[in-house]
């Protein structure tokens, strides 16, 4: 099915160049229509990578919220941009990003305490399905027998954590950015 979909997409693109930016072809309008209908969003933007999408989302959050900080959670991956690479090997001392623990009441307390400085919280919704492990790769996700390392109780706890995080961000007027590229929708 995957190969057939890719072949159909390639055929629909015809003789267009491999890089298409902007509404240059009717199929792009079709895709925009589908994405806005499915997502319920008024606007959709295309990016060349997940890193670019996160950079744009963070920039928009900082501009619109008029606050400097972003929050991310330990073990999550938000691209190659040094603004979200706070681990070993990043020579930049990231002063505008806080890295907190997933599913921790102390993290929620920190966000609440620093709400006047925090523009956005980045979270990877699938992280809780594989605690302590990197998210699954595309090949694994295409397998219909995908298993997670989380049991149902852990998945339920993570769902509650995400709901608490969403409620806190709404209350504190902080943008909550779900960085999710593994489920096939490819929206950050």
What are these regions (language model features)?
Residues 1-23, 32-44:
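Glycine-rich phosphate-binding segment of PLP-dependent enzymes
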Residues 15, 25-26, 50-51, 74-78, ...:
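Acidic, glycine-rich active-site loops and adjacent beta-strand->loop/helix elements
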Residues 20, 118, 176-177:
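Hydrophobic beta-strand scaffold residues
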Residues 30-147, 152-153, 157:
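PLP-dependent aspartate aminotransferase-fold enzymes
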Residues 132, 187-188:
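Short, function-defining helix-loop hinge/capping sites that tune catalysis or transport
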Residues 139-187:
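Catalytic PLP-binding core of fold-type I/II PLP enzymes
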